[in-house]
A protein has these predicted regions:
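A glycine- and small-residue-enriched flexible loop/hinge signal that marks low-structured segments
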Residues: 1-181
Length: 181
């Protein structure tokens, strides 16, 4: 682009390189942040990543909601509704994992704290579980589901909110006192 800022549509086009199952070996496909200024919902990029995983049938897409759905939203009920609406706007597939948000972490390269989407962490947990256990073991829970480097979560759903998110195909990430994230 001429302004050096890629839109979600341009990023979705770049993801099309992953459609080639013969030349591209792929197990985990990360969406990254689900929002840029040109596509406030993030649906374009998330849908493209999900479509690739669904078509290939040999990988899993990892999706986080749009940053504005959870970061800077003071009310947890609104965050729950936002995340559910985001997930409901995406196609349904067995080849994608949608998580509930962003973690606040220290960026040692820029010496600042920032919010980062959890889809990279979720994919990392899946990769780690595959290496220490077997692919059919859950990467969640207190033993295998610890998110590293999280200072806090932008959205820490309670039990009722987690139940609502499960119904919307969202895998909630929560912080439990004494257990971590």
């Amino acid at each position: 682009t001429d302004d050096f800022t890629a839109t979600n549509a341009e990023i979705a086009t770049a993801y099309e390189k992953f459609n080639d199952t013969e030349n591209v070996d792929l197990s985990l496909l990360l969406c990254g942040p689900s929002q840029t200024g040109a596509d406030a919902t993030g649906d374009t990029k998330a849908t493209a990543v999900m479509d690739i995983a669904t078509a290939r049938k040999d990988c899993v897409a990892f999706i986080s909601p749009a940053r504005t759905d959870v970061v800077g939203v003071a009310n947890a009920i609104t965050q729950t509704v936002n995340v559910k609406n985001f997930a409901n706007g995406l196609p349904s597939t067995s080849y994608a994992v949608i998580d509930s948000g962003y973690k606040y972490m220290y960026d040692r390269y820029n010496d600042v704290y920032r919010y980062v989407p959890l889809n990279g962490d979720t994919a990392g947990l899946c990769a780690r579980t595959d290496s220490v256990a077997d692919a059919w073991f859950s990467p969640g829970g207190f033993n295998r589901g610890q998110i590293r480097g999280a200072v806090k979560l932008a959205f820490n759903p309670n039990q009722t909110q987690r139940d609502d998110l499960y119904k919307a195909r969202v895998n909630p990430v929560a912080n439990f006192p004494g257990q971590g994230t």
